[in-house]
């Protein structure tokens, strides 16, 4: 009941906390009886969000479970050809304006939450006190959003995709969890923004927003391969860049529960050509970085180079940090335990 009627229940003193969605935030802030109850939740700085492409859109058997893959109505065969094209993926990397979607959840200010990397700033520093994001090739990564460049990649991709037998517009299934506050609104804004860029002058993509189940969303959607493009997140478990590789890295022959199954895609022939080369270069770079245990600067540079290659090859698209919800609360979270990684910051 609290998840549905929380704002009214906290007014009546029946619960201690309720999330205030963007649709009612303005009215709560302008009402003298409620404005002092509203604040942003304590930031969860170890969680970052990024968009994942589904490189394995077909049914697939693993040793411990089966992946169903995308439904036929979303044309998985067409998507599989498109996703193997680097220029196609880079049109997304440069075409997405994260400011627009972040503004849905942070109408009072979103700049501090936008990321061009997977690892957040101030996550860790090397032996010289240099922030990890200033190490190696990550130091060269800046804002990606560039409409002109996105269209250049799109225009380069069109003849390549046509030669591969791709039909346009390319269907892009983008699910959301209806129980997550404002995720549906973010998807609508995302669709309008990206299609506005990439469909300017050519019917390039058709983003199809689908509502997943409120319960068991990850098992039903992400782990089941029922998406083309999906907003995912990851929370660091410890303060070393190796923890940020968990959603992407797979050991040789591994069938672990990873977000993208990049190595599986190469090993089983879903991912080919330049994309396969980029995937395997990343895997080898991570394996080399893990072995560096006696030189923190060299270790961080190696991980930074690997993360930069993952992003620059558009195998993943960074989005932002976890944006604290606006809440009405009778609790003081700032009095609770805190750690920048793990779950100590969730204890009261």
Model-derived features: where do they sit?
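Ligand/substrate-recognition segments at binding pockets and active sites
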Residues: 1, 12, 140-148, 155-236, ...
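Short, solvent-exposed loop/beta-turn-alpha elements that line the ligand-binding surface or hinge
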Residues: 1, 30-43, 51-82, 124-148, ...
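Ligand-site clamp/hinge motif
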Residues: 1-28
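Append "and occasionally in soluble cytosolic enzymes with long acidic Gly/Pro-rich linkers
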Residues: 79-198, 305
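A ligand-binding cleft/hinge motif common to bilobed small-molecule-binding domains
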Residues: 22-35, 236-241
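Sec/Tat-exported extracytoplasmic proteins
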Residues: 14, 29-33, 55, 95-109, ...
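Paired acidic/hydrophobic, glycine-rich loop segments that form the ligand-binding mouth/hinge
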Residues: 16-22, 228-232, 318
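Bilobed periplasmic-binding protein-like "clamshell/Venus-flytrap" ligand-binding domains
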Residues: 102-105, 156-178, 279-330
């Amino acid at each position: 009941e609290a998840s549905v009627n929380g704002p009214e229940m906290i007014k009546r003193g029946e619960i201690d906390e309720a999330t205030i969605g963007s649709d009612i935030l303005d009215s709560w802030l302008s009402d003298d009886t409620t404005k002092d109850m509203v604040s942003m939740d304590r930031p969860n700085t170890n969680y970052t969000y990024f968009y994942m492409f589904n490189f394995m859109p077909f049914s697939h058997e693993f040793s411990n479970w089966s992946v169903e893959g995308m439904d036929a109505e979303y044309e998985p065969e067409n998507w599989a050809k498109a996703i193997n094209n680097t220029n196609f993926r880079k049109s997304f990397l440069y075409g997405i304006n994260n400011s627009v979607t972040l503004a849905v959840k942070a109408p009072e200010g979103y700049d501090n939450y936008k990321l061009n990397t997977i690892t957040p700033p101030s996550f860790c520093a090397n032996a010289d006190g240099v922030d990890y994001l200033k190490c190696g090739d990550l130091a060269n990564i800046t804002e990606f959003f560039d409409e002109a460049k996105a269209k250049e990649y799109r225009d380069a991709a069109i003849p390549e995709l046509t030669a591969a037998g791709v039909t346009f517009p390319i269907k892009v299934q983008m699910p959301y969890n209806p129980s997550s506050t404002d995720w549906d609104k973010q998807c609508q804004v995302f669709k309008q923004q990206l299609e506005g860029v990439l469909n300017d002058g050519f019917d390039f993509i058709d983003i199809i927003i689908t509502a997943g189940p409120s319960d068991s969303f990850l098992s039903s959607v992400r782990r089941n391969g029922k998406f083309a493009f999906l907003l995912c997140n990851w929370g660091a478990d410890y303060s070393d860049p190796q923890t940020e590789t968990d959603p992407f890295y797979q050991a040789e022959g591994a069938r672990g529960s990873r977000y993208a199954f990049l190595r599986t895609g190469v090993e089983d022939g879903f991912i080919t050509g330049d994309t396969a080369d980029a995937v395997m270069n990343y895997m080898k770079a991570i394996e080399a970085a893990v072995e560096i245990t006696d030189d923190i600067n060299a270790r961080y540079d190696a991980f930074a180079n690997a993360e930069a290659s993952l992003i620059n090859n558009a195998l993943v698209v960074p989005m932002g940090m976890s944006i604290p919800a606006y809440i009405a609360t009778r609790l003081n979270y700032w009095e609770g335990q805190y750690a920048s990684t793990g779950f100590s910051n969730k204890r009261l």
